[in-house]
Structures are given as C-alpha cells and as structure tokens.
Amino acid sequence: MILYEYPFNERVRAYLRLEYLFDRLFYFAREGDARHHQIAVATLFDILDATERTDIKTSVLQDLERQRAALQALRDHPGVAQDALESMLAEMERTVSGLAGQGRAGQPLRENEWLVSLRGRLAVPGGATQVDMPSYHAWQHRTEAVRCADLQTWTAPLRPLHDAVAMALRLLRESGRRSEIVAEQGGYQQMLAGKLFQLLRVWIDPAQGVFPEISANKYMIWIRFSAQDGDAKPQQVARNIDFQMSLCSS
C-alpha cells in the first residue's frame, strides 16, 4: 500500500517537511560515495532553512507538553497498561528535555564559518565547484570515514529536533483509526461534524494505478483519485476506488 498524508494546518505541514528532509539527510549521510555526501550536505542546509522560517522548536515542545499532560491523566486509570504508559512518559521526558535544553535548533552549524561559506555557495546553481570553493572539493576527496565523521558531527545538533518531531508525528498518527472506504466514481467527500483534525492519511493499493488529490478544511474533506498516463496531465478516474483512510487528532 502507498501512503499519502495531508495536513490540516501549517504546523503539521512543517513537521512532515522536516520528517522528509531528516529521512533524506540520514540516508545520504551514511557510508557511500562523495556524491551521496554532497546530497547530505545540501539537505542539512535545507533543514536549517526550514527551521528559520518558523519557530518549530516552540511548536513541537508545546505539542509534546500537551500530549504529556494527557498521558499523565491516565495514570492509575482502569484498563490502561501502566508499564507501557510510564515507558512512554519517560521517553517523552527525555525527548522534551533534549530539545528544550539546547538553544536555537542547529545553532552550532550557523556558527561554523566554513559551513556558512559553503551554504552561501550552494545557494548559487553550480556555485560549489572546485573553481568557486576548492576547500569543498578537497573535502569530497577525503576518505569516506572522515566525511562520515564530519557529517555525524554536523547532524548531531539537529538530533533533538528530529527526535521531537518524530515523536509528535508518531503520537498524532497513532490517534487515528484506519477504515475501509470506497470512492464512488473516483471521488469521496466527508463532513467532519465540527471535530478538529490535524492529519488525514490515505492508503492506496499501487495496483489500482491512481493517486489521491486531497483538499480539506475544518468542515469537510474531498478526495479525488486521478491517474497519470505518459506526458498528459493527470485525469480524474470515473471508476470506484477502494482505499483506506485515517483521520488523526492527537
């Protein structure tokens, strides 16, 4: 099944973007060719850009504090596995403390003069060639072990933010209930009855050859399934589509 997610607000949209960027960063920062590490460095700067556009640290801390208060209220509640609850609260405490205990996310990277210079060069198409920045060219020719160690050092200041965003999204996703739905003639809509949701998740069997185009507000969601054929624009299908959906509101 292919999973598609749609955020109901800009805060969750920012979380999803950071999740995507962190996934790409950690993948390309592993052992590999210097070209993989080029992508890792560029993605590192993308994350810095994303964190500068909004106060993501404050947002995710507020979300986790709210979740922690809700979980603490379940202590000694009948039917709740207390060992699992205490384990989750301890994990949440470590995550919150790790992020709250540091300053601005990624600040050491902004104070690294060489990285600041490289970030400026990478903002120019083709600007980090050996002609423009020979020190970066030399770095790419260092041993794989040295490059990996540097990347681990540079990603370390962002780990607390990654862990906090990952936990916030995990708790949000776990709040939804997955259900089987049929989109008649390729379309589906649902009234939300005034309940506030934060994330819509849609699963599609890839064998159906379609993808969802989603729009939503606090009153209603619309899902239209389309297919892409060659170079033509995607076209909405007119057949029934089986899919699964979950509405999340942690």
UniProtKB/Swiss-Prot annotation:
Its main location: cytoplasm. InterPro entries: ZapD, ZapD_C, ZapD_sf. One of its GO terms (biological process) is FtsZ-dependent cytokinesis. Gene3D superfamilies: YacF-like, YacF-like domains. One of its GO terms (cellular component) is cytoplasm. It holds the Pfam family ZapD. It comes from the Bacteria. Keywords: Cell cycle, Cell division, Cytoplasm, Septation. It is found in: Cytoplasm. Cell division factor that enhances FtsZ-ring assembly. Directly interacts with FtsZ and promotes bundling of FtsZ protofilaments, with a reduction in FtsZ GTPase activity. Interacts with FtsZ. Belongs to the ZapD family. This is Cell division protein ZapD. It comes from Bordetella petrii (strain ATCC BAA-461 / DSM 12804 / CCUG 43448). The lineage of its organism: Bacteria, Pseudomonadati, Pseudomonadota, Betaproteobacteria, Burkholderiales.
